[in-house]
Amino acid sequence: MTAPDDTDRRLIAATQAGLPLDEAPYARIAAELGLTETQVITRLSILHAQGVIRRIAIAPNHYALGMIANGMSVWDVDDAQAEALGERIGALDFVTHCYLRPRAPVWRYNLFAMLHGQSRAEVEQKRAQVRALLGAACRADDILYSTRILKKTGLRLKDG
């Protein structure tokens, strides 16, 4: 993998907050950076193939869509099954983030999944679906509800 050059970094900086809402977003970015639309698309494709950019996707604001109940569900599952179970949970359409994390002496949970709903009752129903999917592999679970957004962004490269 080749490290991103200055042009790649400028391209990442120009797109990291999202693509412009435009009929031709890549052409608009190209004009801002002094590139052609083809160069922008090619560079983004290479950065994606190298794993520098994981994905380019629409990311709706779930709060604006009425999804105001958000909880990080945490699960204590057998370590030997955790990856396979995490993949199954991550495939659920109502799970937006799913992570394996190391346990800590005072924290038994190793599988985390973010659930969203229009109410806590809806999120609890989704939690019950995850619990049913995990079955006997789930030894314990909990949910940590968001109370306030302090910061919400993706990775940002510093200018310069």
Swiss-Prot record:
Keyword DNA repair: no
Reaction it catalyzes: siroheme + 2 H(+) = 12,18-didecarboxysiroheme + 2 CO2
Annotated keywords: Lyase
Gene3D superfamilies xrefs: 3.30.70.3460
EC identifiers of the protein: 4.1.1.111
Subunit structure: Forms a complex composed of NirDL, NirG and NirH. All proteins are required for the total conversion of siroheme to didecarboxysiroheme.
Name of the featured protein: Siroheme decarboxylase NirH subunit
Gene transcribed to yield this protein: nirH
